[in-house]
Amino acid sequence: MPSRVLITSALPYANGPLHFGHIAGAYLPADVYARFRRLLGDDVLYICGSDEYGIAITLNAERAGMGYQEYVNMYHKIHKDTFDKLGISIDFFSRTTNPFHKKLVQDFYTELQSKGLIENQISLQLYSEEENRFLADRYVEGTCPKCGFDGARGDECQKCGADYEATDLVHPRSKLSGSQLVLKETEHAFLHLERMVEPLLAYIDTCYLPEHIRKFVTDYIKNLRPRAITRDLSWGIPVPDFPNKVFYVWFDAPIGYISGTMDWAASLNTPEAWKDFWLEDSTEYVQFIGKDNIPFHAAIFPAMELGQSIPYKKMDALVSSEFYLLEGCQFSKSEGNYIDIDTFLDTYSLDKLRYVLAATAPETSDSEFTFMDFKTRCNSELVGKFGNFIHRVLVFAEKNGFKELAYSANLLEDQDKQFLDRAQQIVRDAQEHYSQYSLRKACCAIMELAALGNVYFNDQAPWKLLKEGLSHRVEAVLFCACYCQKLLALISYPIIPGTAWEIWRMLSPKSLQLDSLDKDRVVDLWNRELLNFSEEVFSLTAPQLLFTIVD
């Protein structure tokens, strides 16, 4: 029976363009998993959206001379366009300024407050008398209290790496006006996370976590402390009965997964449909993030959910990536270590990029994108193994007049059957890799199947069989090779969907009925592809090159 699967990726911050690190970490893995689960025939909903509040947005909007809403509107569109260009198959891309978000965030707060999990406290914060407002860390710079570097940020020193509170800076000043700042008392609401340690530990024991982060998550939960969830800003979700305060972005943003699903349901004129995913325990909920977001998704948001009387679905699996670097350094547009995605796609095909990002995904440790590795993988793997297998078989078939290939049991020899059995086993291996969220291993399975096909075609040498007048054997070999290609397209589709579709188009297998499929959301195909192949017929069309050499 099909499963209902909810997939979410960390909401991208509407404060700048996306780069390869974002895509390889949280969005391509989620897209690949969504495509895989759709292939299995499951009821999949992939929700994402723009995170549109927070200090960094107000700071950069002011620097750009733009209104806050105008600024986030710009990046909401940019991000959506980027995901579309990259083939990230998000079912609905919402935003935290959606019409459902404000009330839902305030309801979360009110419920937590009523249960004694939120209390107000007085604290000292940096205040600009010239600007007449409190300034949070992103607005502040000064002298690092650890190394003495002048120009350190309000939350960490970019020179020595120390982290601290903005109030620890020596000679703090406003980034906007340059004015000196003073300490002034202010009141904030604090979420008492330390009161949720036991239920959080019990919950996290039931949740899939990559083994390399489980200890970190457990230790983090055991050491939870009260955390301020309000800010002195004008841009954000207003806090009920607390004048001039808005919610800290990391209190409101995760609730955007729920409000975004409400937004999706409303867009379909089925306003209650969100409940099928968020209020049904049978839903399988998988969350994809980068490692810098682990505390918020593994502890803070689950604590907020546990504090609600409405039984919102909590994640069943947290898939966290490590950092993805560019030539060994962090992506940084301001420091010139950056690749513009649009410019890159003007030169290289989308599936080349998707494949290399998947093959080098930072799953258990930091990894990097390098142009040399990109070139090597494209030329050696995509062209030399994958593309070569597809092209040589189909060109040989066309050149020698084989347009219709049908199964014939009496023509298959033992080596053919062994080849097909091994091909099907690799498909089952790929299914296991996708189920365990490993893009790297899935890429290895793809190349293993392509290599298997190449070896089989070489060993059978149909060009020799043709010279010997054994056309019946040639037909059997071509059928087996094309069946392998059909399976190769299947296991490739989650990662390189455009290429997989092109293979299916050239093979025109009777079993697929391509006209009835949605190219961008192929569904319910995986198990059917592994069924008995005895009724399959291929109607071959003119072969096209799938990949070209990268110079």
UniProtKB/Swiss-Prot annotation:
Motif 'HIGH' region location, chain numbering: 12-22
Positions that bind ATP: 333
Origin superkingdom: Bacteria
GO BP annotation list: methionyl-tRNA aminoacylation
Pfam families per the UniProt record, alphabetical: Anticodon_3, tRNA-synt_1g
Transmembrane segments: none
InterPro entries per UniProt: Anticodon_Met, Met-tRNA_ligase_1, Met-tRNA_synth, Methionyl/Leucyl_tRNA_Synth, MetRS_core, MetRS_Zn, Rossmann-like_a/b/a_fold, tRNAsynth_Ia_anticodon-bd
One term of GO molecular function: metal ion binding
CDD domains in the cross-refs: Anticodon_Ia_Met, MetRS_core
Subcellular location: Cytoplasm
Residues at which Zn(2+) binds: 144, 147, 157, 160
Keyword ATP-binding applies: yes
Entry cofactors: Zn(2+)
Broad class of the protein's primary localization: cytoplasm
Annotated motif 'KMSKS' region, positions: 330-334
GO cellular component, one term: cytosol
Keywords: Aminoacyl-tRNA synthetase, ATP-binding, Cytoplasm, Ligase, Metal-binding, Nucleotide-binding, Protein biosynthesis, Zinc
Reaction(s) catalysed (UniProt annotation): tRNA(Met) + L-methionine + ATP = L-methionyl-tRNA(Met) + AMP + diphosphate
EC number: 6.1.1.10
Cofactor: how and how many bound: Binds 1 zinc ion per subunit.
UniProt family annotation: Belongs to the class-I aminoacyl-tRNA synthetase family. MetG type 1 subfamily.
Functional description taken from the UniProt entry: Is required not only for elongation of protein synthesis but also for the initiation of all mRNA translation through initiator tRNA(fMet) aminoacylation.
Binding partners and assembly: Monomer.
Protein name: Methionine--tRNA ligase
Species of provenance: Chlamydia abortus (strain DSM 27085 / S26/3) (Chlamydophila abortus)
